[in-house]
């Protein structure tokens, strides 16, 4: 009984950690897909300003992220890339999202005293695609 009492909390913490990092990975996948959707819109020949950001934010909402409105989406439409002497113009869409662990951060606040422990972390995903107007 003593062994169970000592190992069960550790085993539960490891199990919860696996679920938490799985949730973080799933959130990062939604961010990556949102950046790709925004980049697909941004590289079109008749691009209208603001539509790439709107499309990425729409994907975040459809991905059912909590507080999807707190994500920031930025577009850099004129990134020049040189490969083997050839230059191509690309667009880069970057999505930043404040991710809050549900269990691990409150546990960390109990164990380690400090102002920065337990706050949200920023997950970042970006996508770069060649502009089709060339």
Predicted regions and their residues:
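Short Pro/Gly-enriched coil loops immediately N-terminal to beta-strands
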Residues: 35, 95, 120-123
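Alpha-helical assembly-interface signal, strongest on the long, hydrophobic N-terminal helix that forms
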Residues: 1-60
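Low-complexity, S/T/G/P-rich flexible repeat/linker segments used as non-globular hinges
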Residues: 101-134
């Amino acid at each position: 009984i003593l062994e169970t009492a000592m190992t069960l909390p550790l085993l539960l913490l490891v199990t919860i950690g696996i679920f938490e990092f799985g949730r973080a990975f799933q959130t990062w996948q939604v961010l990556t897909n949102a950046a790709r959707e925004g980049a697909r819109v941004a590289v079109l020949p008749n691009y209208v300003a603001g539509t790439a950001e709107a499309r990425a934010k729409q994907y975040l909402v459809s991905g059912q992220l909590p507080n999807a409105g707190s994500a920031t989406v930025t577009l850099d439409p004129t990134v020049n890339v040189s490969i083997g002497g050839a230059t191509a113009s690309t667009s880069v869409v970057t999505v930043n999202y404040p991710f809050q662990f549900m269990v691990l951060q409150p546990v960390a606040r109990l164990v380690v005293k400090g102002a920065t422990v337990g706050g949200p972390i920023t997950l970042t995903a970006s996508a770069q695609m060649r502009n089709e107007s060339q």
